[in-house]
Amino acid sequence: MKVKKGGGGTGPGAEPVPGASNRSVEPTREPGAEAESGSESEPEPGPGPRLGPLQGKQPIGPEDVLGLQRITGDYLCSPEENIYKIDFVRFKIRDMDSGTVLFEIKKPPVSERLPINRRDLDPNAGRFVRYQFTPAFLRLRQVGATVEFTVGDKPVNNFRMIERHYFRNQLLKSFDFHFGFCIPSSKNTCEHIYDFPPLSEELISEMIRHPYETQSDSFYFVDDRLVMHNKADYSYSGTP
């Protein structure tokens, strides 16, 4: 696939590139209630996540999530709605200025994965990631995010991701990427380019002082219907 360019935002850091964390990414289960273009003023703290007007709405389309002004209180679709069996198997972030890889996550091959007792499996396992970066991460200008994913035996038309980033429930930036068409039973690789506008010193200071209050929702659509929803939160303090 071609490299796709995003619409700006706050985000990913490394001589190592300033901002790269020595732990980089820590996959976890989602905390119960933890509570990118940049804002030029310090946001007012908002209330914690809560159920919104989209909860229970079906189907959910791109215009629905583009209207959201806070992090969602829960996932807007179930794992079972991923009928296309889209599976992200590798994720890499690099600083576009230096080319340095900041971190990389890769799923082991199916043959090497441990057997799972499905009765004990968290249905939302794998849908939440916690990121840990150093303060310099907030000053990067451009980052490339490479994703590698497989699809099942159905063709995937008009595959699209909308990713919305918030600090204390104030929208910082919305990214909109189009993957296009994916043939059945294929493995696909695509790099999205995130352009990050400058953040005010006041906002950077607040985001560093309040780890994990920067959060994001990633919505994935096929033919304008929501089929996957992932969440993440972020620390820029450089410590777990």
Curated annotation (Swiss-Prot):
GO biological process: endocytosis; lipoprotein transport; mitotic cytokinesis; negative regulation of caveolin-mediated endocytosis; negative regulation of clathrin-dependent endocytosis; nervous system development; visual perception
InterPro entries assigned: Ig_E-set (IPR014756), PDE6D_unc-119_myristoyl-bd (IPR051519), PDED_dom (IPR008015), PDED_dom_sf (IPR037036)
Positions of modified residues (Phosphoserine): S37, S39, S41
Bias (Gly residues) ranges: 1-12
Record's GO cellular component terms: centrosome; cytoplasm; intercellular bridge; spindle midzone; spindle pole
Molecular function (Gene Ontology), one example: lipid binding
Binding site for tetradecanoate: Y131
Compartmental location: Cytoplasm, Cytoskeleton, Microtubule organizing center, Centrosome; Cytoplasm, Cytoskeleton, Spindle; Cytoplasm, Cytoskeleton, Spindle pole
UniProt keyword list: Cytoplasm, Cytoskeleton, Endocytosis, Lipid-binding, Phosphoprotein, Protein transport, Sensory transduction, Transport, Vision
Post-translational modification: Phosphorylation suppresses its interaction with KLHL18 and down-regulates its KLHL18-mediated degradation. Phosphorylated more under light conditions than dark conditions. Dephosphorylated by calcineurin.
Family: Belongs to the PDE6D/unc-119 family.
The protein's role, per its UniProt record: Involved in synaptic functions in photoreceptor cells, the signal transduction in immune cells as a Src family kinase activator, endosome recycling, the uptake of bacteria and endocytosis, protein trafficking in sensory neurons and as lipid-binding chaperone with specificity for a diverse subset of myristoylated proteins. Specifically binds the myristoyl moiety of a subset of N-terminally myristoylated proteins and is required for their localization. Binds myristoylated GNAT1 and is required for G-protein localization and trafficking in sensory neurons.
Quaternary structure note: Interacts with CABP4; in the absence of calcium. May interact with GTP-bound ARL1. Interacts with ARL2 and ARL3 (GTP-bound forms); this promotes the release of myristoylated cargo proteins. Found in a complex with ARL3, RP2 and UNC119; RP2 induces hydrolysis of GTP ARL3 in the complex, leading to the release of UNC119. Interacts with NPHP3 (when myristoylated). Interacts with CYS1 (when myristoylated). Interacts with MACIR; interaction only takes place when UNC119 is not liganded with myristoylated proteins. Interacts with ARL1 and ARL3 GTP-bound forms. Interacts with ARL2.
Record's comment describing the protein's domains: Adopts an immunoglobulin-like beta-sandwich fold forming a hydrophobic cavity that captures N-terminally myristoylated target peptides. Phe residues within the hydrophobic beta sandwich are required for myristate binding.
Protein name: Protein unc-119 homolog A
